[in-house]
Amino acid sequence: MFEATTILGYRGEMGGKKFALIGGDGQVTLGNCVVKANATKIRSLYHNQVLSGFAGSTADAFSLFDMFERILESKKGDLFKSVVDFSKEWRKDKYLRRLEAMMIVLNLDHIFILSGMGDVLEAEDNKIAAIGSGGNYALSAARALDHFAHLEPRKLVEESLKIAGDLCIYTNTNIKILEL
């Protein structure tokens, strides 16, 4: 279900300034065939105050995006309240409970994973989250680079996704990054 991509979210503070970034590769795979190498799976929401990215079924992911964006607008960009309401609304709709997609949403203060089952997970360290087939590779690389290297945030996201792209056959190194 989550083959064909890697999405990495990273937030924190450097030099007294908060940052938030999301990056993703561009590969779309259908079975054992790459059908697109430069897809965009990340976007900014709510007047460029929230970043998001998806992994999984494209149609299901757009359903997730639409639903989350509507809730985010109604909560005037409050990410924490939006993810709570997202989960509540999700549990009420039997159709939504079967979506085969996941999302990462983040701003300067929070980072969450939203699942196609209606689960909302805050990143363990409230700093780094990854989803998709190469997510564990990207997460491991990002944690190591965050802990031991003093890289600029954009470089950390880029290098972590490159490592995932080198290891995961469903992830390429055609990387796109958005930042707040």
Swiss-Prot record:
Pfam families reported in the protein's UniProt record: Proteasome
The protein's Enzyme Commission number: 3.4.25.2
One annotated Gene Ontology cellular component of this protein: proteasome core complex
Catalytic activity: ATP-dependent cleavage of peptide bonds with broad specificity
Main location (coarse class): cytoplasm
Subcellular localization: Cytoplasm
SUPFAM superfamilies: N-terminal nucleophile aminohydrolases (Ntn hydrolases)
Annotated function: Protease subunit of a proteasome-like degradation complex believed to be a general protein degrading machinery.
Protein family membership: Belongs to the peptidase T1B family. HslV subfamily.
Protein name, entry field: ATP-dependent protease subunit HslV
Organism this protein belongs to: Helicobacter pylori (strain G27)
